[in-house]
Amino acid sequence: MGKTIGIDLGTTNSCVAVLDGGKARVIENGEGDRTTPSVVAFTDDGEILVGSPAKRQAVTNPNKTLFAIKRLIGRRFQDEEVQRDIGIMPYKIVKADNGDAWVEIDGDKKAPPQISAEVLKKMKKTAEEFLGEKVTDAVITVPAYFNDAQRQATKDAGKIAGLNVKRIINEPTAAALAYGMDKKSGDNVIAVYDLGGGTFDISIIEIDEVEGEHTFEVLATNGDTHLGGEDFDNRLINYLVEQFQKDQGMDLRKDPLAMQRLKEAAEKAKIELSSAQQTEVNLPYITADNAGPKHMAIKVTRAKLESLVEDLIKKSLEPLKQALADADLSVSDIQDIIMVGGQTRMPKVQAAVTDFFGKEPRRDVNPDEAVAVGAAVQAGVLQGDVKDVLLLDVCPLSLGIETMGGVMTKLIEKNTTIPTKESQTFSTAEDNQSAVTIHVIQGERKRAGDNKSLGQFNLEGIRAAARGVPQIEVTFDIDADGILHVSAKDKDTGKEQKITIKASSGLDESEVDKMVKDAEAHAEEDKKFEEMVQARNQADGLVHATRNQLKEVGDALSQEDKDAIEKACEELEQASKDGDKEAIDAKSQALMEASQKLMEAAQQQQAQQGAEGAAGGEQQSSKADDDVVDAEFEEVKDDDKK
């Protein structure tokens, strides 16, 4: 049975870990890094780049370099957060036929799960190279506050990447697992403050320890799926754009190339200001006008950055208060605070959390790796390799149906431990009603229309009767991934209708299957591309070695033979440029055949040099022997030594 890997699919960076000898190990990618940028780029020649190679070329290819795609996953195009991102992102965000937010590359529309699948494929390959075996099973993490549509879209991304997603778990819960594995005794109530690249979560988790077995029970969770490091970056970018406009009278927002350079510089400056009090954003030749090139050189202090993002930090404290209230706990009940996500390295964020809880957060959990480590632990639990851990997660938002008067009637309250199943009996609103529409919604508002619509279906064939007489049992069943299954049953006729909520947006099964096939086709293309590169490299090496031999022993050949070899070299070079692997192989073979006499001449020369070397060595040896004088030894008795 193959290993199950744990993947933290992040907004900014992703990470993969596996249980190795009972301990979770973070795996380095092909570039030697423990985290991989969640960046996917499409080049002009059709190549797909993922991770650092994609990030490095972003400045020269801003419209086709996709980052922070997690902010779009499972979202509708008209969502306020998506509309806000459209004005910031250099790539094109478009409305799909089903109303989802997709991206467009060279006129080709792509769903966010397709893009996330490229990052997951990279994680899968990283794990396979380390383990030396094929990997198909994975546990993938999502923000605790992800709704049903976002969780389903993440599962779709895993399927497109060729992974069997055994479990979707919440990021703060995963971080708690990573932390709890080292804490071997006693009960504990912890708060996990997770501020990542694009999402924010707070979870209150109780860890109970009984005879070495740990139960992780999530008491409450809250958050904002559109608050993270990207928003902090954007505040700094806007400030720099405004300062430049004041100084130079030019708006950089109209120049995608300049904005991409500015994004990189802002991210770097933000990171530097976590350890320094001041930094300078220095971008020569950022743009140009009729008067010539323009340069940016703007000093930014830590205090300035803090003032730009102060409201974002405050915004993260509201869910903390709500989560504590939902868990029926006070600040003094929290024994430990874990901070997860790269943005928690900012001193002002750490200070705000310290002030809120009245104690310092723990520093021994790596904020970039903890979530992947926890996912690997959960993978070990599912595989049976970890016996003493039980994870009890919760659904982040209330679930219910729309009832008469446009009211939301809740069947499952938020922060209910999952998996769970709840049933409630409803009736008809009118006399002789033969069908009912079950409209499934998620959220905390009383008015159904103010909540997130997850989908709807009809139960037909209800027997004619006065209003209020038919009995329709609606059942909500949430699985361990937090994905909802709904059924409605007419108790009188026994007729039943079931759906797995895919949200009114989302990808249907046929779309996912098509994307899986596309991904498999790409895998074949990638393999061919690798083989082509290998063939080209071998061809270049062969041409280089042949020409070197021509220089060294070419005099031993006739001019006709030399011309034939040079012609074969040129033909192989041309085949290499044309990029036809079969032609490269054929021309390589032709060059080897044409060079037969050249190789023989080279071997003869080597043999001659070897023979001359050996003869010279013997001569030296005999001369050396003539100069040797036999030594005369005299035995010295012990008595003579004294």
From Swiss-Prot:
The lineage of its organism: Bacteria, Pseudomonadati, Pseudomonadota, Gammaproteobacteria, Alteromonadales. Residues 627-642 have a biased composition (Acidic residues). The gene is dnaK. Residues 570-642 are annotated as: Disordered. Residues 570-585 have a biased composition (Basic and acidic residues). Belongs to the heat shock protein 70 family. This is Chaperone protein DnaK. Acts as a chaperone. Residues 600-620 have a biased composition (Low complexity). CDD domains: ASKHA_NBD_HSP70_DnaK-like.
